[in-house]
Amino acid sequence: MWVGVISLFPEMFRSVTDFGVTGQAVKKGLLSIETWNPRDFTHDKHRTVDDRPYGGGPGMLMMVQPLRDAIHTAKKASPGKTKVIYLSPQGRKLDQKGVEELATNENLLLICGRYEGVDERIIQSEVDEEWSIGDFVMTGGEIPAMTLIDSVSRFIPGVLGDFASAEEDSFANGLLDCPHYTRPEVLDDKEVPSVLMSGNHKDIRQWRLKQSLGRTWLRRPELLENLALTDEQEQLLAEFISEHNAK
């Protein structure tokens, strides 16, 4: 996958290209990330990238010319058909379904806003989709862009050592993930559930599914409203609720 990024602070993306799973993906050639700074497309000695909004009001907007030139240059550098995304509080909220949709694209161009945002005409003429990571405001689109890159890259074949990790994570099937345990067997008098050491794969699968359903019911019950549970899932959830209420 190729990802282009338009940002006034391209150095921030070293945390994506140099570290962790995404850094390994870059080294393996599975993920390519290129950045363009609108400041490099300015024509004045101050390298100005902000401008006053028409109608007055507080704050500034990103200057049209440097931003637009950066976008056009990035589009030309893309290896193929590219989906252009503007990270914005007004965009569609990113969730697991959205991540999986975005992961089907071979090329993405992410525009990171700053100040009070960008000229609406840039969005209308250059942007395919707007995406948000939540109902809150940040100082810029860089961290949302890094969040999007990190989550989408997990679905690139070969990025994760075991692709099942992406398929079994929280939200992958509409549910929160089940609890996980590693050594030691006893930690501060708390023992690993015996079923996980039983070697019975059927029992382990059912335990994990039951815990996943129960954790979703406890912490994010609204997620269950949108799911059509199987008979097995209905039974396991009922058992979890009964056991929980009996405590």
Swiss-Prot record:
Quaternary structure and partners: Homodimer.
Under Enzyme Commission nomenclature, its number is: 2.1.1.228
Function as written in the Swiss-Prot or TrEMBL entry: Specifically methylates guanosine-37 in various tRNAs.
- Biological processes annotated in GO: tRNA N1-guanine methylation
Q: Which residues form the signal peptide?
A: none
Q: Which gene encodes it?
A: trmD
The protein's name in its UniProt record: tRNA (guanine-N(1)-)-methyltransferase
| Positions of S-adenosyl-L-methionine binding | 113, 133-138
NCBIfam families linked to this entry = PRK00026.1 (NF000648), trmD (TIGR00088)
> InterPro entries, alphabetically?
Alpha/beta_knot_MTases (IPR029028), tRNA_m1G_MeTrfase_C_sf (IPR023148), tRNA_m1G_MeTrfase_TrmD (IPR002649), tRNA_m1G_MTases_N (IPR029026), tRNA_MeTrfase_TRMD/TRM10 (IPR016009)
| Gene3D superfamilies the record matches | 3.40.1280.10, tRNA(m1g37)methyltransferase, domain 2 (1.10.1270.20)
What's any one GO cellular component for it?
A: cytosol
Question: Can you say where in the cell this protein is located?
Answer: Cytoplasm
**Catalytic activity of the protein:** guanosine(37) in tRNA + S-adenosyl-L-methionine = N(1)-methylguanosine(37) in tRNA + S-adenosyl-L-homocysteine + H(+)
Q: Belongs to which family? A: Belongs to the RNA methyltransferase TrmD family.
Molecular function GO labels:
tRNA (guanine(37)-N1)-methyltransferase activity
Q: Which UniProt keywords apply?
A: Cytoplasm, Methyltransferase, S-adenosyl-L-methionine, Transferase, tRNA processing
